[in-house]
């Protein structure tokens, strides 16, 4: 895939659209309880990008931020509720984008399972991926 290529994405209702410039920094499944609850899923697949490679195309008045914990926030659409983004002090200069909100494919497949100590037993796991407990 072409480095510096831009790919688009957005929320379920289309009120918020964005573009991210490749390359991505990483891609991983997050099993933490907050991600599971924010998305109503067994885990969430995130792709990390440099923050200055994220461009909001439309919906700045629809994109809202929820402080999910000290030093972390989640971006969602105020119309449809889609959680699309995550930023944290722990990863300065990065914007994490929920892979399911990106239209098409990015430049890599998931490489790891993060916060694996919190995974749910009913979700099948790709055991070939690297595992991180936190």
Per-region residue spans from a language model:
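A short Gly-Trp-Pro
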Residues: 1-134
């Amino acid at each position: 895939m072409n480095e510096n290529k831009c790919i688009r994405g957005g929320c379920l209702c289309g009120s918020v659209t964005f573009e991210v410039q490749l390359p991505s920094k990483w891609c991983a499944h997050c099993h933490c309880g907050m991600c599971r609850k924010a998305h109503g899923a067994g885990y969430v697949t995130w792709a990390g990008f440099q923050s200055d490679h994220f461009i909001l195309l439309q919906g700045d008045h629809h994109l809202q931020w929820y402080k999910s914990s000290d030093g972390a926030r989640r971006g969602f659409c105020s119309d449809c509720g889609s959680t699309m983004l995550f930023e944290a002090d722990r990863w300065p200069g990065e914007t994490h984008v929920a892979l399911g909100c990106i239209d098409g494919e990015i430049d890599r497949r998931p490489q790891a399972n993060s916060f694996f100590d919190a995974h749910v037993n009913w979700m099948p796991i790709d055991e070939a991926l690297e595992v991180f407990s936190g």
